[in-house]
Design a protein with these regions (language model features):
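A short core secondary-structure module
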Residues: 163-164, 168-215
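Hydrophobic, small-residue-rich alpha-helical packing segments that form membrane-like cores
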Residues: 146-150, 165
């Protein structure tokens, strides 16, 4: 199995790497300063202006919507495996690069849903402005009052009333909902509680300005507020046209599974890129600091941290690339075990590598003088987002037991 980038992907990868070196990394201090200013002004979820500038550069260089698959854009589209290499590079500056190239979650997954399952009218109204970067979106699935790791527990109701659907319920960890550019939610709820377990749920498009939709609060992660915000949202008699249904009634669970396959590749490769950045920082710090008469890089315990990090990152990358190649060759359903495995492995590796980098940095590692603490918060949250480790381990074990 060849896990390297194709000729087309190699060309894009070179251009993305140059874009990162020439534009993204130099913009990081400006981004941090602008975020601080926006927070002090009471608008923490507004986009720092420097990112808009980077978006224009990326678009002008043809580095826009690179996540789109070959089936969508045969002239420019990449396979899942090819885009995975690019996702890793963008993960090295995870707060800036994906947004600058219009490849941010949850927009990428939402765009894929609209492309695969949306009507022509839905695509014209929502997919086109998302592809153009004029709006942002969110995905409302997790709920505070039930164990959402079991998606069949979802309690939010979507009830048909004439030509409309009426929505009642509460969602949280709705990523992107605080961004003022967020115009649309894809919401998963129950349309038929009496149906077969995996046919009870449906997905509908809910504009953010719909009466009855209220963002109650922004949820921080370990005290850090995501730039786009994680929202808790209530739906109190929110009414949308029946034409906002995605696919058919009862298809919500199947659509969710289709959405999460490639998205998990993107998440995991970005985590690997983030881990590589943390390893770079660990090595740089170990060479600069002297303790007990010699650089930290000459201390055996620090060398062990560096070596373990190198091993674990490479293992995670190979496993993720195998999963990506399987999605391309046999489809998401057949790659289910490998997709579950990477969702466990990649965030854990990122957490472990970042934690070692924090340790080598000492007190600076847990301060805001380095990005490591924020990096750790983001990586740790991914062990819960899109399903906690335990659910994926359960699925892997189930598949193994069936094979024996």
């Amino acid at each position: 199995m060849d896990l390297g980038p194709s000729a087309r992907a190699s060309e894009y990868l070179s251009r993305v790497t140059t874009f990162m070196d020439d534009n993204v990394y130099p913009a990081e201090p400006t981004y941090a300063e602008q975020r601080r200013t926006l927070t002090e002004q009471g608008t923490p979820h507004h986009l720092p202006p420097v990112v808009e500038e980077l978006k224009e550069v990326a678009r002008s260089q043809g580095l826009w919507n690179l996540f789109l698959p070959e089936s969508t854009d045969p002239a420019h589209g990449l396979t899942v495996a090819d885009y995975a290499h690019i996702a890793e590079v963008t993960g090295r500056s995870i707060e800036i690069a994906p947004e600058a190239m219009n490849c941010s979650a949850p927009d990428t997954g939402n765009m894929e849903v609209l492309h695969m399952f949306g009507t022509d009218a839905q695509r014209a109204q929502w997919l086109e402005p998302l592809l153009d970067g004029r709006i942002r979106s969110s995905f409302a699935m997790t709920e505070p009052d039930v164990a959402s790791s079991d998606a069949t527990n979802i309690a939010t109701r979507i009830e048909r009333d004439g030509d409309d659907y009426v929505i009642n319920g509460r969602k949280w960890w709705t990523t992107g909902a605080l961004d003022p550019r967020c115009a649309i939610l894809i919401l998963m709820g129950k349309t038929d509680p009496g149906a077969e377990t995996h046919r009870q749920q449906s997905m509908v498009l809910v504009p953010m300005d719909t009466p009855g939709v209220t963002v109650q609060r922004s949820l921080p992660v370990f005290g850090y507020h995501d730039q786009h915000g994680h929202g808790e949202i209530t739906f109190d008699g929110a009414r949308v046209p029946a034409s906002n249904l995605i696919g058919e009634e009862g298809a919500g669970f199947a659509i969710a599974q289709a959405r999460l396959g490639p998205g998990r590749i993107h998440h995991c490769m970005r985590m690997i890129g983030l881990a590589e950045r943390a390893l770079d920082m660990m090595i740089d710090r170990s060479r600069e600091r002297v303790a007990f008469g010699k650089p930290l890089s000459d201390q055996g315990v620090v060398r062990e941290s560096i070596a373990l990090s190198r091993i674990e990152i490479d293992q995670a990358r190979l496993l993720t690339m195998k999963a990506a190649a399987l999605i391309d060759s046999v489809g998401t359903k057949a790659a289910r075990t490998e997709i579950a495995a990477i969702k466990v492995v990649a965030p854990r590796v990122a957490c472990d590598v970042i934690d070692r980098a924090i340790q080598v940095h000492g007190g600076a590692g847990v301060s805001d003088d380095t990005p490591l603490a924020a990096m750790y918060a983001g990586a740790r949250s991914l062990r819960l987002a899109d399903g906690p480790d335990e659910v994926h381990l359960r699925d892997i074990a189930r598949q193994e037991l069936r094979r024996r």
